A protein has these predicted regions:
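Helix-biased detector of long, well-ordered alpha-helical tracts
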Residues: 1-178
């Protein structure tokens, strides 16, 4: 996918694109941060290599990472779930159990979302956080020499998925990151 190319097209098309390009947007008038990530079956995860529970945990956690990078405290999420019509009730129950556990651990409330049909499972989380510092951080403020902090290793989830789907040996830690 040509993400940067698409972002440039979007920026040039929208009347106001000042928030486009960062993982997290700070809305000054509301004093909140907003982020959204989508996980799609067979691209970001495989149902052959993960459980619905772990998928639920991961779907929330990737958003919490974006909020943490912006120095904000997560407060609310919405969950949009797309899935095939033959999806079992137990899948939804376990997925939301994983979502709920991460929310409970971080004092986050699920405030809504959407459910729709699709060929494959896709889960999209919108997370809202409150500013916890007088400082704002974002890519647009970054400059040469800045210190960058991350909440995990870059590419470990993709590497774990690749190892699992290609039947390659990988350390258990890497497999769990998927």
């Amino acid at each position: 996918m040509k993400e940067l190319n698409f972002l440039n097209i979007i920026k040039s098309t929208l009347d106001n694109s000042s928030f486009i390009g960062d993982d997290c947007a700070y809305l000054d008038d509301l004093d909140i941060f907003v982020t959204q990530d989508t996980l799609i079956e067979d691209i970001h995860f495989s149902l052959y290599t993960t459980t619905p529970y772990l998928l639920g945990r991961k779907s929330v956690s990737v958003n919490l990472s974006d909020l943490a990078a912006s120095l904000s405290v997560p407060k609310y999420i919405t969950v949009s779930l797309s899935m095939p019509k033959l999806t079992k009730d137990s899948f939804v129950s376990e997925l939301y159990r994983g979502i709920n556990d991460v929310c409970r651990e971080n004092d986050i409330q699920v405030i809504g979302g959407d459910i729709t049909g699709a060929e494959n499972v896709a889960i999209s989380i919108c997370a809202i956080g409150k500013k916890q510092s007088k400082f704002l951080t974002s890519r647009s403020y970054a400059k040469k020499g800045d210190v960058i902090l991350v909440t995990g290793e870059f590419g470990s989830s993709a590497a774990g998925l690749h190892a699992l789907t290609q039947y390659l040996y990988a350390d258990e830690y890497l497999l769990q990151k998927h």
